[in-house]
């Protein structure tokens, strides 16, 4: 996962760009919130394409930040956390999206099939793995956690990997299968949700 570490910086920069753009337009805060995640996603995708040409993770969607690793063939799509629950976002109401949220449980290393990489090396074949990168921004700082979700209805995950912005720190993480509990990310609420709640409280008091 060390190759994904630039995603933290790129996401933060994209978010900052979107906030700056909003200052030049005239929409309600509700309209901004509806479009903000989509705009951040698109800018993140475009930045990754431009800045990470030599990265093994390549963009595979014309509109969204959906990536695939050329070495292991693993896929990843990035989505904001559910602002109402602070948890992993639900899948879109499509067959393909639900399929990505219903995967086989995590296998021990010895049972993972192998394949030949483009460089001719023997590598794990993770072509059937789809990760969901759930992100939030708090005070301008991004938090991203990668999940392998195995139950679309209950949002159960068998793997949770915090994504760090530093390759050295990321390489030190030892990945272990997560308890198959409902995946929630407590205490992570994005900026717009906090600001919206404060605004609502002020209006109610007024």
Residue ranges and their predicted role:
Residues 87-145:
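Catalytic cores of nucleic-acid endonucleases
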Residues 1-38:
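Interdomain/boundary linker segments immediately adjacent to catalytic/signaling cores
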């Amino acid at each position: 996962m060390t190759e994904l570490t630039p995603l933290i910086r790129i996401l933060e920069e994209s978010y900052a760009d979107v906030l700056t753009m909003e200052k030049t337009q005239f929409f309600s805060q509700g309209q901004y919130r509806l479009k903000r995640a989509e705009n951040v996603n698109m800018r993140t995708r475009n930045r990754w394409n431009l800045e990470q040409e030599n990265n093994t993770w390549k963009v595979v969607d014309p509109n969204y930040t959906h990536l695939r690793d050329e070495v292991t063939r693993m896929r990843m799509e990035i989505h904001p956390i559910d602002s109402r629950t602070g948890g992993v976002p639900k899948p879109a109401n499509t067959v393909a999206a639900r399929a990505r949220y219903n995967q086989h449980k995590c296998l021990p290393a010895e049972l993972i099939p192998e394949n030949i990489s483009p460089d001719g090396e023997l590598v794990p074949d993770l072509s059937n793995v789809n990760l969901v990168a759930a992100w939030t921004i708090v005070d301008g700082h991004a938090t991203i956690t990668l999940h392998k979700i195995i139950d679309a209805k209950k949002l159960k995950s068998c793997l949770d990997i915090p994504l760090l912005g530093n390759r050295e720190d990321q390489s030190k993480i030892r990945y272990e299968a997560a308890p198959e509990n409902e995946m929630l990310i407590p205490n992570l609420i994005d900026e717009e949700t906090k600001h919206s709640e404060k605004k609502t409280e002020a209006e109610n008091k007024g």
